[in-house]
Amino acid sequence: MPEYLINGIPVNFPFEPYQVQRDYMARVIECLQNSSNGVLESPTGTGKTLSLLCSSLAWILHKKAQVQASQRTNVSELKEFEFEKKKMGGGGGGPKPEMDKLLDELNENSGKEGGRWGVPKIIYASRTHSQLTQAMQEMKNTSYGFMRAVILGSRDQLCIHPEVAKEEGNAVKTNLCKAKIQARACSFYSRVEACKERPEITGSTIMDIEDLVRVSTKLKACPFFMSKELIENADVLFMPYNYLLDPKARKANNLELANTIIILDEAHNVDKMCEESASMQIRSSDIALCIDDVTSIMKVMDNTVAIPEDDDAKKDFTIDDLALLKEMLLSLEKTVDEIPVMFSQGGSTQPGTYIFEIFEKANIKEGNYHIIAQLLENIIQYIATITEKNNFVRRGGGLQILAESLSIMFAGSGPQYRESIDKCYKCHIDIEEQKKVRGNTKQADGWTATKQLVPSVKANAKVINFWCFNPGFGMRQLLGRNARSIILTSGTLAPLKPLISELDIPIAVKLENPHIIDGSQVCVKIVGQGPDKESLNSSYGNRDNPKYISSLGRTILSFCPIIPGGLLVFFPSYPLLNKCQEAWQETGIWAQISRTKPIFVEPRGKDQFLNTMTEYYAKINDPDGKGAVFMAVCRGKVSEGLDFADMNGRACIITGLPFPPLKDARVILKKRYLQEVRTRENEIISGDEWYSLEAARAVNQAIGRVIRHKNDYGAILLCDNRFHNPRQKAQLSSWIQKHLNTAQHPTFGPIVRELSQFFRNAEKTLPQAKLTRSLAPLGPEPPIALVPDSTSLLVSGETKKKLDDIKNNFIKIENSNAVTAFKLSDYQHAHRSDATAASGKDFLSRLNTQVRTIDFNDMSSAGPSSQAGLVAIHKRERSNESTMVTQQKKRKVVLIPQETISLDDSLEVLEVKPERQAPEDRVELLKVIKSSIVPAQYKRFLVVLTGYRNDRDFGTMMGGMVEIFNRPELYYLLKGEI
């Protein structure tokens, strides 16, 4: 693999790096060499992950070489100093401090400190395990695949014990796992120590989730604990954000952050992750569950006959401990009940330290926290043990929530910690809503028992929210553990300045890379109005406007025939997506879009999501299909990290700005917090700027789903007139702003025309991704003309040119219906037609006969039939006309097996069906149109025609006609209309 010298470090890279990749790798190495922190943005498709891995791993190898060289030259000197130190150990305090100083310097120079001779580990964190898996696969494909890497996962992904794996929720699995280990009842755990040196483990240098599970299952050893054994010798640790940012998760995984390189990929979410990991919520119903759980355990302990004591169910607590804990919980419940809250005012907000006042009234405080935390852990494990062996009906869900809440509250101690809490936190108390919980059901976390154990919510029940509003609070915890460097990177970090000010850590290295594509590969348009000239604005006050919803639907419908392959449509929220779907289904717009491209909607469930994505990709790769539409939500699964390269995503429509809910208590408090702490010196953004920036970041992330590599191309359509606002434009990624500098048309027609021209040019000049076809095309046979030749229309030259553009686009979009998309082998086993040959009459005379036609637009008949092997045919009756001759005999369709004829012969057999002619008489034309489309479409047709007479806007008129006559069998009617 080629080697390139970057900042003095030899970096192996699979190809000649682009300048943006060189710049990116130089900044990464600069951070590592100087032990500094960096914020690096490089758009999706610029090879960010590859550049990040190659540069950081190259620096690690270089550092190892330095350490080994230093070790060889200093090891003898080090031993001599140690020998002298031992001799002088008891001889007074004169020269000893100097000797210690020299020894420390040698240790540092030789790299002896840190367990691996001072070579830092890389901790690579991202949002999801799927993103981590992609990064690990990228590492396998580099020349650094020999370096050791392991991923940390949860028991949800790694546990192979049949009894534990079947449980729902990671918390349940965790405590049941601990109980089995304590009782020595897990054979998989017992085999970890014996198997960790096996060749199957040591021979695999990069172990992702699938590798860990596969190899460990073969060895009958626990993948979860095997991953922990691999940490010590790993060069790179891959893990989700929460494993790194959550203090409890760091402790559980024994993560040592000193002298580590922390890489936070997809860091556009890191500020929220920092805030979330430092926040907690506890409800009155959770406290009531705790009381019920403790009471049930006390009854069990008081009645030893019900559950006999055994070694597996050892208790590390007494009934007196439980009685004391119950007293605390009852006091806590009473304290929470007595907190005054005005529901009409949106709850009560107090300073962050108010949370300590609440718990101190129940005698839960800093001094005894560790004792209470240990007691809670012991009880939860005991519940897991007796639940498994004796069908105990409780699961300890409330106790688990309480334990996690206390760990966040008491993550630090002392006056300085309390001062930080008062500055960075707010305690918000609100009324707890009644939940509907039926018998024999479980909550999503799996902790509610199978019986009805959730106490009914009282009228004075509360929700205690302990919210962190400063992401720097979590980031400083990483710096406080002596991390060598923290690198935040993503495709959508801009604008960098407010992000850096919020994170509140020193940032020495910054980069905002341009995209590697040029102007011919992207078309960015702001669509401020629909084809009916209705303003497109998804503001909260306009979302219930039926005219807006209808216009948005017709806008999407108008773009569908123009855009090849996949079209992604992002909505600001699920409620708006659902509202539009219902409205469009009622008005028929949904059905019209579906006829052009099948529609897929982003589901919320994990299993449903995977199935939907599989079906979508299959439809895109169907050689006989016309692509598909995927309707999703900003900040949803589709917008975060999924790859829609090439035909999977040729265009992205943003239907609105996804602002956070304005009246949400947390949003209100966040804006208020920023206003309070903002000064001229700290350059923190205002509350309103943060609110606007939240929407822009979600938009930038959704846009990043398309244009995934240097040869990719696509369109970005911002369908909300608020994008014309200069302030909103400035918050888009810089590479998008660059392409927004071109003239933006206020009307719909020119946008449609330019979009059509963009895709025509792209298909001619740019590399095209190939779909996997089961059958090869016949050859370079021209497609069937789907629209009459514009030269035959009695219209102006300008109109002819515009119609030619529309026609050519239709032909390309509908190319799957061309003769070239079919094979003679498709008809090889078809039955011969028993119709007799037609006499040699002219074409018009044949229209009076009964004919059998193959419907090439029927996608359901694509491919050989699984039942009868017949070509799908549709019988069409022709009525008698006085101008036509008498009925003639039926034409004979000859179908010949492929192997008996040559290619040249086959081209002679297939006849292209003559194009249909629209009536020249206007009255007759209107009759044909009215009989060919549904009444609602005909009414829409008259409105569009009237509008054209009034304003003479050809683009708007054609946009409307595209919506109405969007089926190939109706294209010939465009001739009569114009």
UniProtKB/Swiss-Prot annotation:
It comes from the Eukaryota. Residues 7-318 form the Helicase ATP-binding domain. GO terms for cellular component: nucleus. It catalyses: ATP + H2O = ADP + phosphate + H(+). Its EC number is 5.6.2.-. ATP binds at residues 42-49. Gene3D superfamilies: P-loop containing nucleotide triphosphate hydrolases. SMART domains: DEXDc, DEXDc2, HELICc2. [4Fe-4S] cluster binds at residues 159, 177, 186, 222. InterPro entries: ATP-dep_Helicase_C (IPR006555), DinG/Rad3-like (IPR045028), Helic_SF1/SF2_ATP-bd_DinG/Rad3 (IPR014013), Helicase-like_DEXD_c2 (IPR006554), Helicase_ATP-bd (IPR014001), P-loop_NTPase (IPR027417), RAD3-like_helicase_DEAD (IPR010614), Rad3/Chl1-like (IPR013020). A probable ATP-dependent DNA helicase implicated in DNA repair and the maintenance of genomic stability. Acts as an anti-recombinase to counteract toxic recombination and limit crossover during meiosis. Regulates meiotic recombination and crossover homeostasis by physically dissociating strand invasion events and thereby promotes noncrossover repair by meiotic synthesis dependent strand annealing (SDSA) as well as disassembly of D loop recombination intermediates. HAMAP family: RTEL1. Belongs to the helicase family. RAD3/XPD subfamily. This is Regulator of telomere elongation helicase 1 homolog. It comes from Culex quinquefasciatus. The lineage of its organism: Eukaryota, Metazoa, Ecdysozoa, Arthropoda, Hexapoda.
